């Protein structure tokens, strides 16, 4: 079972998450979380992205159901194909109804509501086994009905507000295609904390 999450990110959080993935790849001590070292099938797959007039970005992303459980419990997650415990696979199947729930359109990342939108495959071992994501012949991203999220995100990067000191930095190939969900969640939580402090 995999989930599709629809959410909105502020451009600041989106760019910060991209920067976090660059830092993690260059410096292993940066942004250490229980999510570090998880298999690549936990990577977020962006299937739709749109920049709105107010500067926020609407995203549709797909990730394994077991990843949701790991985020909630803040514990490491092992791919069910390599896990020795029977608890992890059951977390991705037994806790979710077989009937898809309606998608939740949220106004901000901090207020996101994780819902099961559709079962993309009867019982995928990992998201990489789902055949609806053929590789893009242009960039190696993933196509959905002829739409390549990575090519589209590269085009959107130029539309997003850039920090003054980030003008010379280019988005690496993997940052748009394989953003870790825990990285996004961590940055969103920090963003919410900062907003709360300002309100006080």
UniProtKB/Swiss-Prot annotation:
BP terms from Gene Ontology: symbiont-mediated perturbation of host cell cycle G1/S transition checkpoint; symbiont-mediated suppression of host innate immune response; symbiont-mediated suppression of host JAK-STAT cascade via inhibition of STAT1 activity; symbiont-mediated suppression of host type I interferon-mediated signaling pathway
Keywords of the record: Activator, Early protein, G1/S host cell cycle checkpoint dysregulation by virus, Host-virus interaction, Inhibition of host innate immune response by virus, Inhibition of host interferon signaling pathway by virus, Inhibition of host STAT1 by virus, Interferon antiviral system evasion, Metal-binding, Modulation of host cell cycle by virus, Transcription, Transcription regulation, Viral immunoevasion, Zinc, Zinc-finger
GO molecular function: zinc ion binding
Chain location of the short sequence motif Nuclear localization signal per the record: 196-200
Zn finger intervals (unnamed): 136-151
Region (Disordered): 78-98
Positions of short motif LXCXE motif, interaction with host RB1: 114-118
Function of the molecule: E1A protein has both transforming and trans-activating activities. Plays a role in viral genome replication by driving entry of quiescent cells into the cell cycle. Disrupts the function of host retinoblastoma protein RB1/pRb and isoform early E1A 26 kDa protein stabilizes TP53, which are key regulators of the cell cycle. Induces the disassembly of the E2F1 transcription factors from RB1 by direct competition for the same binding site on RB1, with subsequent transcriptional activation of E2F1-regulated S-phase genes.
Subunit structure and binding partners: Interaction with host RB1 induces the aberrant dissociation of RB1-E2F1 complex thereby disrupting RB1's activity.
Protein name: Early E1A 21 kDa protein
